[in-house]
């Protein structure tokens, strides 16, 4: 299985090139790039007001207001410090870098810029991990509508944090492959007792969401992660956040890969069958043609 990159490579490569050219004393060049990411996220890299010595990285998330309610602004301020500026119109967060005043730790700055989406997501997880560490119960469940028709729920208890993703399968084939995929997660936990518990429910929401307006339907699935203190403590939580916030994309990416692999195998098998049929086809009988005098025609 393939782990999706947590960081955004386009941001990192673009900034790294800009920093490298600036450090070498090269003349700065204009940049204007707009690109998308999973979950409807949109990025924009540009020179504000046409100033080529400044590079702005902006991100747009449809659900950013929900993340703000869980401390996203504070977390970003802590991580990015003076690089965080007022967002440009149409975007939620903007980072500004001055090529004439390069930071000392360029590699670290570039990497953190590439983690912008992850760091926006991180606030809700850090908040509920902290609730669990402090033994708080009864806190309101976090509800993040991270896609138009899909939702993430986060809830903390004294001994665990429960994260539930709702997801929509486009067709029946996706449901079948998704179930097989989730069964592999259950089997994997038997091999590693430190892995979190993973549950999958189809059509109906899990018991944790019985009192909510969670969607119900034949194409609806719910994936539940039960995270224990060994997954949420200060040492492990960064890696946990890196992995869990991309899980929905990870699942659907592998469903698409599985379907593509199956189609490739089917086409290859069909090609093999056609070769067998062609070999089994009887050769057409050649008729001997003669002239009126009895001579045989010969092909040249």
UniProtKB/Swiss-Prot annotation:
UniProt main location, coarse: cytoplasm
GO biological process: actin filament polymerization; Arp2/3 complex-mediated actin nucleation; positive regulation of actin filament polymerization; positive regulation of lamellipodium assembly; positive regulation of substrate adhesion-dependent cell spreading
Molecular functions per Gene Ontology: actin filament binding; structural constituent of cytoskeleton
Location of N6-acetyllysine modifications: 275, 295
Subcellular location per the Swiss-Prot or TrEMBL entry: Cytoplasm, Cytoskeleton; Cell projection; Synapse, Synaptosome; Nucleus
Keywords (A to Z) from UniProt: Acetylation, Actin-binding, Cell projection, Cytoplasm, Cytoskeleton, Nucleus, Synapse, Synaptosome
Coiled coil: none
Protein family (similarity comment): Belongs to the ARPC2 family.
Subunit details: Component of the Arp2/3 complex composed of ACTR2/ARP2, ACTR3/ARP3, ARPC1B/p41-ARC, ARPC2/p34-ARC, ARPC3/p21-ARC, ARPC4/p20-ARC and ARPC5/p16-ARC. Interacts with SHANK3; the interaction probably mediates the association of SHANK3 with the Arp2/3 complex. Interacts with DNAI3; this interaction reduces binding of the Arp2/3 complex to the VCA domain of nucleation promoting factors.
Name the record gives this protein: Actin-related protein 2/3 complex subunit 2
């Amino acid at each position: 299985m393939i782990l999706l990159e947590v960081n955004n490579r386009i941001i990192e490569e673009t900034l790294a090139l800009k920093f490298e050219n600036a450090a070498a004393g090269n003349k700065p060049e204009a940049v204007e790039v707009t690109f998308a990411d999973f979950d409807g996220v949109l990025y924009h890299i540009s020179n504000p007001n046409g100033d080529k010595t400044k590079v702005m990285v902006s991100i747009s998330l449809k659900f950013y207001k929900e993340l703000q309610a869980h401390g996203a602004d504070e977390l970003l301020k802590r991580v990015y410090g003076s690089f965080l500026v007022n967002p440009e119109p149409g975007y939620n967060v903007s980072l500004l870098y001055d090529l004439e005043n390069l930071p000392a730790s360029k590699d670290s700055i570039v990497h953190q810029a590439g983690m912008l989406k992850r760091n926006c997501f991180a606030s809700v997880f850090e908040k509920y991990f902290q609730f669990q560490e402090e033994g708080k119960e009864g806190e309101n469940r976090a509800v993040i509508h991270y896609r138009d028709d899909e939702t993430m729920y986060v809830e903390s208890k004294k001994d665990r944090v429960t994260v539930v993703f709702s997801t929509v399968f486009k067709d029946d084939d996706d449901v079948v492959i998704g179930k097989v995929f989730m069964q592999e997660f259950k089997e994997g936990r038997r091999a590693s007792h430190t892995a979190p518990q993973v549950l999958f429910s189809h059509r109906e929401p899990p018991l944790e969401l019985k009192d909510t307006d969670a969607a119900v339907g034949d194409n609806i699935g719910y994936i539940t992660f039960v995270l224990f203190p060994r997954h949420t403590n200060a040492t492990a939580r960064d890696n946990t956040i890196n992995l869990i916030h991309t899980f929905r994309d990870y699942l659907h990416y592998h469903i698409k890969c599985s379907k593509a692999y199956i189609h490739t195998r089917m086409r290859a098998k069909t090609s093999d069958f056609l070769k067998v049929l062609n070999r089994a086809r009887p050769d057409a009988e050649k008729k001997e043609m003669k002239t009126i005098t009895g001579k045989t025609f010969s092909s040249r």
